[in-house]
């Protein structure tokens, strides 16, 4: 039963993962994101009071 011999299957598994790990990450990391994070001010803004006409 050749299916039980792990030597060729293990080599194919390791080689395929090696190819995936060398080809896919540069393609994924090469994308640019449209929404770049911006630094926000740490100062808290004072809320403006609402001028409601109370009748």
Curated annotation (Swiss-Prot):
Give the record's membrane topology. Single-pass membrane protein
Assembly with partners or alone: Component of the ATP synthase complex composed at least of ATP5F1A/subunit alpha, ATP5F1B/subunit beta, ATP5MC1/subunit c (homooctomer), MT-ATP6/subunit a, MT-ATP8/subunit 8, ATP5ME/subunit e, ATP5MF/subunit f, ATP5MG/subunit g, ATP5MK/subunit k, ATP5MJ/subunit j, ATP5F1C/subunit gamma, ATP5F1D/subunit delta, ATP5F1E/subunit epsilon, ATP5PF/subunit F6, ATP5PB/subunit b, ATP5PD/subunit d, ATP5PO/subunit OSCP.
Which GO BP terms, alphabetically? Answer: proton motive force-driven ATP synthesis
- Which Pfam family is one of this chain's hits? ATP-synt_8
Q: What PANTHER family does this protein's entry cite?
A: ATP SYNTHASE PROTEIN 8 (PTHR39937:SF1)
Supply the name of the protein.
Answer: ATP synthase F(0) complex subunit 8
Q: Which domain of life is it from?
A: Eukaryota
Similarity comment text for this entry:
Belongs to the ATPase protein 8 family.
Q: Where is this region: Disordered?
A: 34-55
The compartments listed are: Mitochondrion membrane
- Report a single Gene Ontology molecular function: proton transmembrane transporter activity
The job of this chain, per UniProt, is described as: Subunit 8, of the mitochondrial membrane ATP synthase complex (F(1)F(0) ATP synthase or Complex V) that produces ATP from ADP in the presence of a proton gradient across the membrane which is generated by electron transport complexes of the respiratory chain. ATP synthase complex consist of a soluble F(1) head domain - the catalytic core - and a membrane F(1) domain - the membrane proton channel. These two domains are linked by a central stalk rotating inside the F(1) region and a stationary peripheral stalk.
Asked if Ion transport is a keyword of the record, the answer is yes
Species this chain originates from: Salvelinus fontinalis (Brook trout)
GO cellular component terms, alphabetically, are: mitochondrial membrane; proton-transporting ATP synthase complex
User: Which InterPro entries does UniProt cross-reference here?
Assistant: ATP8_metazoa, ATPase_protein_8
Query: Which keywords fit this entry according to its UniProt record?
Result: ATP synthesis, CF(0), Hydrogen ion transport, Ion transport, Membrane, Mitochondrion, Transmembrane, Transmembrane helix, Transport
Q: Span of the secretion signal?
A: none
Q: Please state the protein's primary subcellular location.
A: mitochondrion
* Keyword Nucleus listed: no
